[in-house]
A protein has these predicted regions:
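Short helices/loops that flank or line small-molecule/ion binding pockets
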Residues: 33-34, 53-57, 129-143, 278
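Hinge/lid segment of periplasmic solute-binding proteins
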Residues: 1-25, 40, 49, 77, ...
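Glycine-centered hinge/linker elements that transmit conformational signals in sensory
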Residues: 52-54, 95-124
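Paired acidic/hydrophobic, glycine-rich loop segments that form the ligand-binding mouth/hinge
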Residues: 141-146, 163
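Short, solvent-exposed loop/beta-turn-alpha elements that line the ligand-binding surface or hinge
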Residues: 1, 40, 64-69, 87-107, ...
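Short helix-initiation/N-cap motifs at beta->coil->alpha
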Residues: 45-49, 122-136
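C-terminal capping/gating helix-and-loop segments adjacent to ligand/active sites or protein-protein/ligand interfaces
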Residues: 10, 222-225, 243-293
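Extracytoplasmic/periplasmic substrate-recognition and gating elements
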Residues: 36-37, 116, 155-222
Length: 295
C-alpha cells in the first residue's frame, strides 16, 4: 500500500479504512509540439518557462501551458504550484499557512505565466474540460490533468501524440502530484456472537480483493490507479506508459479536506487566484485570506 494513501485514513495513529482505488494528477504534454520547438520535457519551473517561450515562438497559435483557475477546480491549481514550491495549504503542524512565502512565490509564478502570454487566454473561466479539449485538438502543448485523460481523449475522437510525466517543480523542490482515493471500511457489530468468524471472513475478502492480478485487472476495468505498489508494478510490466504513474503515485499529496474550514479555504484560494488574474497583489490577497481563516 502506498504510504501517502494509507495515511489519509489515519486518525491519531490508527488506520480506520483501507484505500481501494486512486486517481492522481500529472503533466500531459504533446510530444510533436515539444519536438517541433526543440525542447525537452520540463521538470523545473525554469525549464517550463523556457519551454513555453520556445513553443510560443515556434507555434504562436498554440497555448504552451494550460491553467484552470475557475470555480470548478481553482483549488487544484493552488495545490499544483504551492506544493511544487515546498508550500501548500497547511504547515508541518497541520495549521493553515495560506500566506507563506512559498505560496506567494508559487502563485506569482503561475500568474506570471498567464501575464507572459504562455497560457490559455481565460484561466478564470476555462475549466480543465475545456483544456482537455484544447489539448486533444493540439491547441495546448502542456497541461496538468487526471489519469483518465487518455479515456477522455479517446472517447472524444482525438488523435494526438502525447505522454505523461511528473509535474514540474521549482528548483530544489521535489515534484508533488495531487492524489484522490476512495476507501473500504468495515464496521464491527458488537452484538454479533460470531466475532471470530466475521473477522476471518473480512480478512478473506480483503485477501481476495487485493490479490495482485485480480486487483490490477479491476483497476483497469474501472479506469483508476491501484493503491498498492505490487499491483502498480504488475500493470507497468504490461503497459510502458503506466510506468510513469508509479513515480507519480509515490509523490501524491492531498487536500486537507478533513479540516472544518476546508470549504471556506477552497473558495478562498479560488478568489485569490481570480483577483490576482485581475492584477491584485498576491501577498495582500493571501494575507487577507489567512486572517479570515485562521484569525
Amino acid at each position: 500500500m502506498y504510504p501517502a494513501f494509507l495515511e489519509q485514513s489515519e486518525i491519531d495513529g490508527t488506520v480506520w479504512a483501507i484505500p481501494d482505488l486512486a486517481s492522481a494528477r500529472a503533466m500531459y504534454y504533446n510530444k510533436d509540439i515539444l519536438d517541433a520547438a526543440g525542447v525537452e520535457v520540463p521538470t523545473t519551473w525554469d525549464e517550463l518557462k523556457a519551454a513555453c517561450e520556445k513553443i510560443k515562438e515556434t507555434n504562436p497559435d498554440v497555448y504552451p501551458w494550460g491553467i484552470d483557475m475557475t470555480t470548478d477546480e481553482g483549488q487544484a491549481a493552488f495545490s499544483y504550484y504551492t506544493w511544487n514550491n515546498g508550500g501548500g495549504f497547511v504547515d508541518e503542524n497541520g495549521d493553515w499557512a495560506l500566506n507563506s512565502d512559498k505560496n506567494v512565490e508559487a502563485l506569482n509564478f503561475a500568474i506570471g505565466l498567464v501575464n507572459d502570454g504562455y497560457t490559455n487566454s481565460d484561466p478564470a473561466n476555462e475549466t480543465r474540460y475545456d483544456l482537455q479539449d484544447m489539448f486533444g485538438a493540439g491547441k495546448v502543448a502542456m497541461m496538468i490533468g487526471p489519469n483518465n485523460i487518455p479515456t477522455y481523449l479517446s472517447d472524444g475522437g482525438y488523435d494526438i501524440n502525447y505522454d505523461v510525466t511528473t509535474i514540474p517543480a521549482n528548483e530544489g523542490c521535489d515534484s508533488v502530484a495531487m492524489g484522490v482515493c476512495d476507501r473500504l471500511e468495515v464496521f464491527k457489530d458488537d452484538s454479533a456472537e460470531d466475532q471470530e468468524a466475521r473477522t476471518a471472513a473480512i480478512s478473506k475478502f480483503f485477501d481476495f480483493f487485493y490479490d495482485d492480478e485480480r486487483y490490477a485487472d479491476y483497476m483497469v476495468f474501472e479506469g483508476f490507479l491501484p493503491t498498492t505498489q505490487t499491483a502498480a508494478d504488475l500493470l507497468a510490466k504490461d503497459d510502458d506508459t503506466f510506468a510513469s504513474w508509479i513515480d507519480i503515485l509515490q509523490s501524491c499529496n492531498f487536500y486537507p479536506a478533513t479540516k472544518t474550514e476546508w470549504a471556506d479555504v477552497k473558495q478562498g484560494v479560488i478568489e485569490v487566484e481570480q483577483n490576482a488574474l485581475l492584477g491584485d497583489d498576491v501577498q495582500t490577497l493571501l494575507d487577507d485570506l489567512q486572517a479570515d481563516i485562521a484569525g
